[in-house]
């Protein structure tokens, strides 16, 4: 006869423990965004004016749009995917320098996103609490036809680069990929496979200078970073050695008229054995 009250007691106790456990779990997972946001802003104020215009906490109404705009892999655009605590959208060098220094100061992981084109979402997901430094505002392009060079910031897309070069010259080009929404920073940091590979090499083979911010917040170019680091950032992977701000590359000659053709083969026609 005492079984039912005992079961009721155990059920109530279990339910209470479950509620406490869930609450504790949610509380532990919930990021201390306001606190981190204020600490981060206070730190950034030392390096730039009005940092609140470029820093978005995950409580900001604009946060979801900014985060999702450059998530190229839908697998990581889910409610269960861990989100960054903050997104920083730099507009000038000091913003990047301050972000690197402040992320190091508060001991939080920093992810650099330049277009978001990677199969594993490496630039916008992490198992640890993290901040995204999103380079989409960093997209200025300067084309110097006379000297046959171009300076392109990391957030510019390949499509934008091709168009700006075409505006200035019909006989100059840059060897890079075919996807117009891939950003320069990530593409060139990974080597830059392109359609003119056989004649002009990889994209990185045509890079003659770069501007980066290193882990100490120093602004460096090819001369000040040295040839070893300059060699490493051209294919060594985005964000491995610093934050890429811009690349300077030589333009290559291209014909005014280009002939494009397409060959289609079916399996019945031994398409698997067909190699161009």
Pin down the residues of each PLM region.
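A glycine-rich, basic-preceded beta-loop-alpha segment at the flavin cofactor/substrate interface
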Residues: 213, 218-254
């Amino acid at each position: 006869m005492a079984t039912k009250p005992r079961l009721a007691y155990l059920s109530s106790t279990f339910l209470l423990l479950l509620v406490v456990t869930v609450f504790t779990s949610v509380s532990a997972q919930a990021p201390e965004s306001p606190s981190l946001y204020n600490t981060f802003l206070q730190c950034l104020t030392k390096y730039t004016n009005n940092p609140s215009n470029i820093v978005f906490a995950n409580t900001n109404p604009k946060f979801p749009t900014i985060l999702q705009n450059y998530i190229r892999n839908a697998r990581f655009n889910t409610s269960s995917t861990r989100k960054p605590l903050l997104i920083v959208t730099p507009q000038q060098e000091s913003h990047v320098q301050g972000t690197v220094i402040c992320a190091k100061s508060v001991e939080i992981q920093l992810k650099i996103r330049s277009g978001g084109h990677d199969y594993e979402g490496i630039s916008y997901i992490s198992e640890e609490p993290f901040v995204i430094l999103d380079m989409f505002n960093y997209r200025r392009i300067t084309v110097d036809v006379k000297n046959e060079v171009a300076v392109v910031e990391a957030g510019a897309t390949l499509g934008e680069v091709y168009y700006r070069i075409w505006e200035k010259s019909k006989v100059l080009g840059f060897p890079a990929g075919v996807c117009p929404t891939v950003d320069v920073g990530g593409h060139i940091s990974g080597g830059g496979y392109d359609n003119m590979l056989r004649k002009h090499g990889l994209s990185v083979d045509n890079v003659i200078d770069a501007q980066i911010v290193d882990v100490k917040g120093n602004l460096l170019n090819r001369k000040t970073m040295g040839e070893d680091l300059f060699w490493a950032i051209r294919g060594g992977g985005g964000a491995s050695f610093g934050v890429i701000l811009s690349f300077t590359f030589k333009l290559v000659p291209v014909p005014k008229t280009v002939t494009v053709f397409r060959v289609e083969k079916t399996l019945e026609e031994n398409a698997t054995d067909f190699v161009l």
